[in-house]
A protein has these predicted regions:
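Gram-negative outer-membrane beta-barrel transporters
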Residues: 367-371, 410-414, 533-535, 564-661, ...
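Structural signature of Gram-negative outer-membrane beta-barrels, strongest in the C-terminal barrel
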Residues: 239-243, 358-361, 365, 373-375, ...
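Conserved C-terminal beta-signal and adjacent last beta-strands/turns
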Residues: 5, 16, 195, 347-371, ...
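Surface-exposed extracellular loop regions of Gram-negative outer-membrane beta-barrel proteins
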Residues: 256-269, 376-383, 438, 442-450, ...
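Outer-membrane beta-barrel translocator/receptor signature
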Residues: 115-117, 129, 138-147, 152-219, ...
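Acidic, small-polar-rich N-terminal luminal/periplasmic segments of exported/outer-membrane proteins
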Residues: 35-173, 515
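Outer membrane beta-barrel strand-and-loop segments of large Gram-negative receptors
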Residues: 339-360, 397-401, 502-506, 512, ...
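Outer-membrane beta-barrel domain signature, strongest for Gram-negative TonB-dependent receptors
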Residues: 223, 229-368, 376, 526-528
Length: 740
């Protein structure tokens, strides 16, 4: 057992499981039982149309509802346990905000003026911000994780990849699904879905979910645990088929997320010694002395309308999405046992998007998809009393896109695609001198007489992204080679409090090559391989400087000593990276499924220009693990008149670097800048019993069962102080469900 849990043995096992499928067809004739154990076909929409996963020349991993439930994939942030070269976490300082990195290209901030590197789409609607991108996996039909730039079909801000989530649709029949989960930290998670018919040609679906829990961090100052989460979502969806060729689906979501973030740890150096951090470290990070809580609230509603019409061998689709929500964040301790650097942030956000799409469904050699996309996103934020500012940010983008695939014969095909995007942004930002003390004084400080800065920067850009693929099919699968480009929008840094800090920066671009194999060597094996090589230019990188730095202009040595800094976003970097991804499935029998995934990544800065000085030899890419892997097994047996399904998944992620002011980084004086490598064993036992009245379900689960306590999941620095966020490790629970 010790060898199995070592770092090298599981890697060898992952490769062995995948390779067994490839070699098996060459050396061993599968037995009759294995012949019947066909791997279920998975249909994906990675190219904006329904296709078999094994036919798509894109690096995509698809997770089914059963995999999500039995694999303890409870929220968006758990997906990385089963997908190679993906790193996901929740950013607690923003409500339900997703920190996502795919193939070493990540985004870990909360500002609406900054663009993510990994896109998240729900029911065909692209989320313009990472706020709200951490959500529950209940009532989900499929999850697709597309790795690598997806600039042609998904557009801007997908240079790392896309997480594409599709929820279930109204069935048009009577149906009910109820589920309750109880777990550690007094967690209760209650969910339900009701389906009902709407006349002869339609259906209505009503859904609700509420989760409440206490913090996984014990507070040594309060001698207890804080409340952690109280989140409620209500959804209503209506589907109506006006004809056999025309269908309309409308979905409305109302949500209210109240989060008291798990207490952080002050890492240093200001304002206190590392006493609390060291004590927590010695106790498996179970404790924190944080005096005041980090409160994050988010409430609002989403609307989605989709109209589909089929005619003359084509599908015409219109998708509209509206997200309208408010956020509040309050923090004044940052993991410390004292009060300092109080921050209160109130923010409004609204996005509206429209997409018109036409796709062909021809038996002939040519198939295509084309469309028009429009997005408008507006936000307004007020922040203080330290570094008080207000920002109004507006963004507008439109794009035309198209992609066609031509089959020369049964073996060879080529795909060509392009997307033209035009966008405009503007920002009105005002800042005032810091107000220390009573937060109500902020109102008195919003006086033009004491205005510190007023700026109205503007940004416009257009970009052409494209993709070319050549594909060769064979009896057991296919191979492909692709070249694709993508870009991440330029813009402004809205936390800036000086004119230099809010100057516009340009868009970031990527060129990527992929070579892939998709194969089913036998009827009970599947082996997928992908090699990628990417070059990123004009990278948008953060620069944190002392106040005395010439480009900052906020003061001299006295201001430096007070911890005053400047924060910039600038196009100062170039990066190259390559890696390999392996995914394999083997079904030795009809009741046993083995899975494995492996991701390698070699990524480094080619250049990182800091005021004429190249710091590429010092700086490291954030959240870019060199190695990720997982192995899993699922066994199904008949027991007590029902099915018993045993599932286990063991995953590993290498160490990663965190946000650090690399230009002034000194290993002798700076706090630790890495997150240690970590592994997790998740297990579950699911019992299903079908009766004439429906299906009853009981799930016993454990996540990260081999490790007690918590672990550091993120480290953040402002230039003057650093704090760490803690993620839970070992958790146990039970789920009870019923559906018909």
């Amino acid at each position: 057992m010790r060898d199995f849990l070592s770092r090298k043995s599981p890697i060898a096992l992952a490769i062995t499981i995948a390779a067994t499928g490839a070699v098996g067809s060459l050396t061993i004739a599968p037995n009759a039982q294995a012949q019947e154990s066909l791997i279920e076909e998975v249909v994906v929409t990675a190219r904006k149309r329904q296709e078999s996963l094994q036919d798509v020349p894109v690096a995509v991993t698809a997770l089914t509802p059963n995999q999500l439930e039995r694999g303890s994939i409870q929220r968006t942030t758990d997906i990385d346990k089963m997908v190679p070269n993906v790193e996901l976490h929740q950013t607690y300082i923003g409500s339900e905000s997703l920190s996502a990195s795919i193939r070493g290209i990540g985004f870990d901030d909360i500002e609406k003026s900054l663009e993510p590197t990994v896109g998240v789409a729900v029911d065909g609607v692209f989320m313009a911000s990472n706020s709200g991108a951490v959500f529950d996996m209940f009532d989900v039909e499929s999850v697709e994780v597309l790795r690598g730039p997806q600039g042609t079909l998904f557009g801007r801000n997908t240079i790392g990849g896309v997480i594409n989530v599709t929820r279930t649709k109204p069935t048009g029949e009577w149906g009910l699904k109820l589920q309750a989960t109880f777990g550690d930290q007094d967690m209760t998670d209650v969910k339900g879905v009701l389906n009902m018919p709407l006349g002869q040609n339609g259906g209505v679906k009503l859904a609700f979910k509420n989760i409440q829990s206490d913090s996984h961090v014990y507070n040594t100052t309060l001698n207890g645990r804080r409340d952690f989460r109280d989140s409620t979502t209500l959804s209503a969806s209506i589907r109506y088929d006006f004809t056999e060729n025309t269908s309309v689906i409308f979905t409305y979501d109302d949500y209210d997320h109240d989060t008291i973030a798990p207490d952080n740890l002050m890492v240093g150096p200001f304002p206190e010694p590392l006493t609390g951090y060291l004590a927590s470290q010695n106790d498996d990070y179970k404790t924190s002395p944080q005096l005041n809580p980090l409160e994050a609230y988010m409430w609002g509603d989403n609307s989605t309308l989709q109209i589909t019409h089929n005619a003359a061998g084509h599908q015409f689709k219109y998708t509209m999405g509206i997200m309208d929500y408010e956020e509040e964040v309050h923090e004044s301790s940052w993991g410390s046992s004292t009060v300092f650097f109080p921050v209160n942030r109130d923010q409004d956000f609204k996005q509206t998007s429209h997409e018109l799409q036409i796709s062909s469904d021809s038996d002939g050699p040519l198939n295509y998809v084309a469309g028009f996309y429009y997005l408008e996103a507006d936000s307004f934020i007020t922040s203080g009393p330290i570094q008080p500012f207000t920002v109004n940010h507006e963004a507008e983008a439109q794009a035309f896109y198209g992609e066609m695939t031509y089959d020369f014969n049964d073996n060879w095909s080529v795909t060509l695609g392009a997307r033209y995007t035009d966008e405009d942004k503007n920002m009105q930002t005002y800042s005032w001198p810091p107000v220390v003390g009573d937060p109500d004084r902020i109102a008195n400080n919003l006086d033009p007489a004491v205005l510190q800065m007023a700026a109205t920067p503007e940004f416009s850009d257009d970009n052409l992204t494209y993709r070319a693929v050549i594909q060769r099919n064979f009896s057991k699968g296919m191979v492909y080679a692709s070249y694709s480009t993508g870009f991440r929008s330029g813009g402004f840094f809205n936390r800036g409090t000086s004119p230099a800090e809010v100057e516009p920066y340009d868009s970031e671009e990527v060129d990527s090559i992929e070579i892939g194999l998709r194969s089913n060597p036998t009827e009970n094996t599947q082996l997928n391989l992908t090699y990628f090589n990417s070059e990123y230019t004009d990278m948008q990188l953060p620069l944190i400087t002392p106040a005395s730095f010439p480009e900052c202009g906020k003061g001299g040595a006295e201001e430096d000593a007070a911890g005053i800094t400047c924060s910039f976003i600038a196009n100062v970097g170039e990066t190259s990276m390559d890696g390999l991804e392996v995914e394999g499935i083997w079904m030795p029998t009809s009741t046993l499924t083995l899975r494995a995934a492996l991701g390698t990544l070699d990524a480094s800065y080619d250049s990182y220009d800091y005021a004429g000085r190249d710091i590429a030899n010092v700086a490291q890419l954030l959240y870019a693990p060199e190695l990720t892997w997982s192995v899993g097994a699922e066994h199904i047996s008949q027991m007590f008149g029902g099915e018993l399904i045993l599932t286990a998944n063991y995953s590993f992620q290498d160490e990663v670097f965190t946000q650090t002011p690399w230009a002034i980084y000194d290993p002798a004086t700076f706090p630790k800048i890495t997150i240690d490598d970590w592994e997790s064993l998740d297990i579950s036992a699911t019992y299903l019993r079908d009766t004439e009245n429906g299906t009853f379900k009981v799930i016993l689960y454990g996540t990260d069962v081999l490790e007690d306590g918590n672990r550091v999941q993120r480290r953040y620095t402002t230039g003057s102080f650093t704090w760490a966020e803690l993620a839970p490790r070992q958790q146990f629970g039970i789920t009870i469900g019923y559906e018909f």
